[in-house]
C-alpha cells in the first residue's frame, strides 16, 4: 500500500505525515511531495522513527515521481487561512494548485483514491472531478473531500458539553465543508438529547470552529494539527477498506445521487474500490431540515465555481 501526501512540507502535511509514519500498516510506503526544498529533509527526519513504513521525500515542480504507484493520494497543498479570510478567499490561489496536482495524478496514478484537504473543499473537489473527467479517468467512487475535521470537532464539542468520552460519540456531519454548509446531525447522536438552544449553539460553534482556531493563532496559522489528525483518520480508514476490512464508515464529501447537490458530504461505506455505498442521511429534525434547505444554494454555487474554473 502506497500513500502519497502532496503539500507535505506544510503545517497539515507534516502533521499528517508524522501520524501516517507511526500508524500505517507495516510494509506500507509513504511518499512526501511539496514544492518546498525542505521536503526530502522532512522525509529523512521522519525516517528515523522506528516503524516499518518506508518513506521518501520529493520537491520541485514535478510531483510525478512521488505519485508513481500510489494507491491513495492526500492533497493538503495550498495557502492557509489568515484572520479576516474565509475559505472562499483561498480559491484564487488554491484552485490552480489543485488543478495542477490532479492533472499529474491523472497521468501517473489514475486509479488512486484521492482525498482533497485543500480548501475551499466544496469547490476544490469539483475542480478535481472536472480535471479527471477531462483526462478520461474520473471514477466518482475514488474522489473524496476530506471533511473528517467537522466530525472530530463535533464529537469533541458534544463530549465537552455533555461530560462524555469523545471516543464514544459519533456525530454524522453532512452537506459541505465551510460555514453554513456544515451540518452536524445532532438529532442522530444515540443516547444524548439536546435542548433547542444547545443545538443552535453547537451547530454554530462547529461551523465556525476553523475561524476560532485562525483567530486564536493570531495570524500565525490555521487548524493544522487537528486537520492533520482528521486527515490521518480518513486516510487510515481508506487503507483498511482497500485492504479488505468490512464495515469501515466515514463521512466524506463525494459525488452523490444529486438529490441535494452534485457533491455532498454524507456517511459512506468504504470498500476495496473506494466508495462501496453512499449511506442514507436518515431522518432529520425540523432544525436540520431547515438548515439543509437554506444551505443548498451556497453549496451549489461553490460547486459551480469549481466546474466553471475547469470548463
UniProtKB/Swiss-Prot annotation:
Enzyme class of the recorded protein, top EC level: oxidoreductase
UniProt-listed InterPro entries: L-lactate/malate_DH, Lactate/malate_DH_C, Lactate/malate_DH_N, Lactate_DH/Glyco_Ohase_4_C, Malate_DH_AS, Malate_DH_type1, Malate_DH_type1_bac, NAD(P)-bd_dom_sf
Record's keyword terms, sorted: NAD, Oxidoreductase, Tricarboxylic acid cycle
MF-aspect GO terms: L-malate dehydrogenase (NAD+) activity
Catalytic reactions on record: (S)-malate + NAD(+) = oxaloacetate + NADH + H(+)
Binding site for substrate: 81, 87, 119, 153
GO biological processes: malate metabolic process; tricarboxylic acid cycle
HAMAP family the UniProt entry points to: Malate_dehydrog_1
Name by which UniProt lists this protein: Malate dehydrogenase
Organism: Pectobacterium atrosepticum (strain SCRI 1043 / ATCC BAA-672) (Erwinia carotovora subsp. atroseptica)
Phylogenetic classification of the source organism: Bacteria, Pseudomonadati, Pseudomonadota, Gammaproteobacteria, Enterobacterales
Gene name as annotated: mdh
